[in-house]
Amino acid sequence: MSDYKSTLNLPETGFPMRGDLAKREPGMLARWTDDDLYGIIRAAKKGKKTFILHDGPPYANGSIHIGHSVNKILKDIIIKSKGLSGYDSPYVPGWDCHGLPIELKVEQEYGKPGEKFTAAEFRAKCREYAATQVDGQRKDFIRLGVLGDWSHPYLTMDFKTEANIIRALGKIIGNGHLHKGAKPVHWCVDCRSALAEAEVEYYDKTSPSIDVAFQAVDQDALKTKFGVSNVNGPISLVIWTTTPWTLPANRAISIAPDFDYALVQIDGQAVILAKDLVESVMQRIGVSDYTILGTVKGAELELLRFTHPFMDFDVPAILGDHVTLDAGTGAVHTAPGHGPDDYVIGQKYGLETANPVGPDGTYLPGTYPTLDGVNVFKANDIVIALLQEKGALLHVEKMQHSYPCCWRHKTPIIFRATPQWFVSMDQKGLRAQSLKEIKGVQWIPDWGQARIESMVANRPDWCISRQRTWGVPMSLFVHKDTEELHPRTLELMEEVAKRVEVDGIQAWWDLDAKEILGDEADQYVKVPDTLDVWFDSGSTHSSVVDVRPEFAGHAADMYLEGSDQHRGWFMSSLMISTAMKGKAPYRQVLTHGFTVDGQGRKMSKSIGNTVSPQDVMNKLGADILRLWVASTDYTGEMAVSDEILKRAADSYRRIRNTARFLLANLNGFDPAKDMVKPEEMVVLDRWAVGCAKAAQEDILKAYEAYDFHEVVQRLMRFCSVEMGSFYLDIIKDRQYTAKADSVARRSCQTALYHIAEALVRWMAPILSFTADEVWGYLPGEREKYVFTGEWYEGLFGLADSEAMNDAFWDELLKVRGEVNKVIEQARADKKVGGSLEAAVTLYAEPVLAAKLTALGDELRFVLLTSGATVADYNDAPADAQQSEVLKGLKVALSKAEGEKCPRCWHYTQDVGKVAEHAEICGRCVSNVAGDGEKRKFA
């Protein structure tokens, strides 16, 4: 028997079947670094229209987690897809380097500043620590396959950036947005510092809930208001609170002007409550026998005075819009030094902003004899005992509620009035302008707009000062007596900024005021406060984007971070940019959800359900992690687990196998000389290129919309359905058995070449390592890297006017599917082995029959059978299978006649008819020794 294997065009490629990504990717990274791939891309894109994605800086502390990976991979997908779309899209990664977490780490190792080290030495240690953290995180980000200017990132602790942060504050001061005030701010007693909104987390806490009676100073005036004369016992206004420790700072009782308030007679006294809450309060305090003596509107009680239960003063009733009927008594204990609503209404009524609590959370001397020096959270019991002793406590119980806590210490925080510097939301219209700017930004997903609008509309002034060691100094001088800013503040700040640009923030603390103030130095003091770290990152649109040469003065097109950044970086950036420039710093804002485990639970080390990106990369490779990110809908929570990553790896194998099939069948193909013109190609091959064209349109649209899971779904559908289960199956016969240089084979290779050129580019933003690997095996002259080019423009398709147009092949796909069902049943019944052992007769109604007949003898190649004939639908025998999909089709199957050709495996009756090749069929003889078979359609 002759060996005809050598006459076949068997697929051959060096592209490995197994990805072995964990082993191969580091080598690719080394090549990217050695070649300066990022620099090559920048050179290739020079002069193109720009797209700037400004990196929100992660905090330089600790190893990267799965959330970091999601963020950086999403950014990288966008940057790479924009590059392929013809943009110059530089990516400058950044890090947030100042602030409390770094201070705490350094304190743990070296002690607090001033103990073993001077403040200057402490700052140097902080800088050193941050630098090591940056290096560690940078290695992991690079390992993810993220391309960027990793050699020249921006750090908020770079001297120039620190200087520009000071300049940003100067601009805000110049525009009139800064003011100083003793306002209640979130205060952590462990940090001994004010906290930003974004540094506050909420946890359940058990607190005492108390109802307290404030006796009226003028009992007769109240009787007159309610129109009663006979009241048994004193009259009191009752407040409800869950923070008894704030009662020493009480300066008023807030009531709602339009609520009805009832005077209620109970045993031995009368109490004033919101009428709608009388029943619930009576139940709470355990009173069943009570009488409502009269009612008045809250406005009638304004400025009547009530005695503080244990302090030596009385307080007014005032009117406030913040009073609700959700809980309590309808009368709100008001301490302007301990709450933002209280502060606002206190300003309106000229109340004292009392703050009897020190920075460590203990009462200051002179507050109250039994409270001085006591921690506020331990004081609740003392205050409750005092109220009981004074006869003012109507009820006490425990309640669990959501309470603000420090994000770092996880301990409860307090509102505490301290002298701080604020960016005002309203004194120069910052709130109104910010709300206007929000409307001009595209928010992705679109619910982000309502979220940040609500936050801006309701947020208090931004406290930007901190009492910390490691941070950018505010660089202000205030008058010793008046505490007013120096009249030349902006000029002085620029002088400080110049020094910081040379020597870093230490230049401020080393500065002798006389150096820049001269004789005025005796009248002014340096403000010791540092800036909130959210000011550092929030000003990077100015301190980084405006000054980096690669951005060429263009504002950022996009900010992309987790959904928690509406109140964090998106907010601080919007505030600062609007205060400085009157406009938003971004055109688009994209947010992604948090990562959760496979059961939708938040990731936690204590539960043991965290997924380490380092582990995933070391076991599966970065491309699997990237594919998981891209295939997950980032607009909600992003579930990840070993099982989910295994599914991503399965999808990866499908894509890799498709790419490998293309490459293996391009063996011996030189596009420069072997390409077949579209009009001369086999129709099915043109259809396949048209499928790629349609897929590319969908994929590019999805990339443009940042809809990456749709990119992956469309890519998978193309590989699995259009190619894998139809086209690639059909062409194997022609590809392997036709003459090597025949139009039939070269047409097929031309299609595969066009498809591969498109596919490798679709993959590149997501499966960057694999795309780079595929690129190296593609035939023809090309640039060294796929990332320097643009989307493939060589695709074409069938015209609708052609008889065998896309609709024709769509119907053929359905016919093929119906034939497959019949073959599978025959295999199950042991009537045939493989499909080539079968011959089918298609009984079709006239319109479908005409389409099938048009393919002539090539119909069998589409159906992967050794024989295929078309007959009239009405002639179908009883055992023909009626199609459920195509009503005008019945399929009958029989065993193919003739012998099996050992070369093409088809069963035909002309095997052995040619003496010189007595073992093979006539078609194979033509392909081996003759002119080769001709194919028009398939």
From Swiss-Prot:
Residues bound to ATP: 605
Position of sequence motif 'KMSKS' region: 602-606
Molecular function as annotated in GO: aminoacyl-tRNA deacylase activity; ATP binding; isoleucine-tRNA ligase activity; tRNA binding; zinc ion binding
Gene designation: ileS
EC number annotated for this UniProt entry: 6.1.1.5
Organism: Escherichia coli O127:H6 (strain E2348/69 / EPEC)
Catalyzed reactions: tRNA(Ile) + L-isoleucine + ATP = L-isoleucyl-tRNA(Ile) + AMP + diphosphate
Enzyme class: ligase
Keyword annotations from UniProtKB, A to Z: Acetylation, Aminoacyl-tRNA synthetase, ATP-binding, Cytoplasm, Ligase, Metal-binding, Nucleotide-binding, Protein biosynthesis, Zinc
Protein's recorded name: Isoleucine--tRNA ligase
Domain comment (free text): IleRS has two distinct active sites: one for aminoacylation and one for editing. The misactivated valine is translocated from the active site to the editing site, which sterically excludes the correctly activated isoleucine. The single editing site contains two valyl binding pockets, one specific for each substrate (Val-AMP or Val-tRNA(Ile)).
Stated family: Belongs to the class-I aminoacyl-tRNA synthetase family. IleS type 1 subfamily.
Entry keyword annotation includes Acetylation: yes
Residues engaged in binding Zn(2+): 901, 904, 921, 924
Cellular component terms (Gene Ontology): cytosol
Summary of the function given for this chain in its UniProt record: Catalyzes the attachment of isoleucine to tRNA(Ile). As IleRS can inadvertently accommodate and process structurally similar amino acids such as valine, to avoid such errors it has two additional distinct tRNA(Ile)-dependent editing activities. One activity is designated as 'pretransfer' editing and involves the hydrolysis of activated Val-AMP. The other activity is designated 'posttransfer' editing and involves deacylation of mischarged Val-tRNA(Ile).
